[in-house]
Regions:
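Conserved HGGG/HGGXW glycine-rich cap/lid loop of the alpha/beta-hydrolase fold
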Residues: 9-58
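Conserved acidic catalytic loop of the alpha/beta-hydrolase fold
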Residues: 67-84
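Gly/Ala-rich beta-loop-alpha elbow adjacent to hydrolase catalytic centers
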Residues: 88, 92, 96
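Flexible "cap/lid" loop of the alpha/beta hydrolase fold
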Residues: 97, 101-102, 106-138
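Conserved alpha/beta-hydrolase catalytic His-Asp/Glu region
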Residues: 121-126, 137-197
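Short beta-strand/loop motif that positions the catalytic acidic residue
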Residues: 199, 205-207, 211
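Catalytic active-site module of serine/aspartate enzymes centered on a nucleophile-bearing elbow/loop
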Residues: 229-262
Length: 262
């Protein structure tokens, strides 16, 4: 494994083979994918810390889905990736849908966890309010946001019986730069749905039955619009799928890539 920086974007690079590019969600990092790396051993895997998140440099201007997608394109171009299997979580799935519809030549397949096309209209104001809280309160605000996310975005079973998963989620969120997190929130709040009917690559959509961000009925509706896609719903699982159900995610990815990768 090596850590590389592309225009101040941190990228963890592992292995050799076809490229796989991993795009985390809001409050995430390259560590979101640690639990499923065993399914990616056949690939040259690029785990990106998105602009303004984790170890990547803070940004001075606004973030948007367009700018996040362009950052992924730049990482791929600079690291010699012409086509890649894309993996995404949450906000990262919106970026993946953007790339698959606007740069289909880049995308071999999609494996998406907690996928959504854009936030429901009623959620946008709350996301903007979270951005403002992060800016106004700084580190204490991030700690409070992390606690709220653990309470609202993980399953009851995870909170009761998977303390390591809870710790991973909380640590991931509360260690974000407050301003970078706020800008990422604003990108999510402004996201618009991609025309996913045009997606022709193999697509895996995974969610949990207690995922309020990507509820099963919404994920199935996305799957109905993508020809040949597979939808998987884990029981007693919330939004942080790879942390809450690591073994199941690992097996599902192994099966998916056995069918759709060299």
């Amino acid at each position: 494994m090596s850590t590389q920086f592309v225009s101040r974007i941190a990228v963890e690079v592992d292995g050799e083979g076809e490229a796989a590019v991993c795009i985390h969600g809001l409050g995430g990092s390259s560590n979101n994918w640690t639990t499923v790396m065993g399914a990616l051993s056949r690939f040259r895997t690029l785990r990106v810390d998105m602009p303004g998140s984790a170890r990547s440099a803070s940004v001075s201007g606004p973030l948007s889905i367009d700018s996040l997608a362009q950052a992924v394109r730049e990482v791929c171009a600079r690291l010699g990736v012409e086509r890649a299997h894309l993996l995404g979580h949450s906000l990262g799935t919106i970026v993946c849908f953007k790339l698959a519809t606007e740069s289909p030549q880049l995308v071999r397949s999609l494996a998406l966890f907690g996928p959504l096309l854009c936030p429901p209209e009623g959620a946008r104001a709350n996301i903007r309010a979270r951005a403002q809280r992060a800016r106004d309160e700084g580190v204490p605000g991030m700690q409070a946001i992390a606690d709220a996310i653990v309470a609202g975005a993980t399953s009851a079973e995870t909170r009761q019986h998977r303390p390591a998963a809870v710790a991973l989620v909380r640590e991931s969120v509360m260690r974000q730069d407050p301003d970078g997190y706020a800008r990422s929130c604003e990108a999510l709040a402004e996201a618009q749905a991609a025309a996913v009917e045009s997606i022709a690559c193999p697509t895996l959509l995974v969610t949990g039955d207690e995922d309020g961000v990507a509820p099963p009925q919404s994920v199935r509706a996305i799957g109905d619009r993508i020809a040949g896609s597979r939808v998987v719903v884990y029981s007693r699982c919330g939004h942080w799928t790879t942390f809450e159900r690591p073994d199941e995610c690992l097996r599902e990815l192994k099966d998916f890539y056995s069918a759709h990768a060299r």
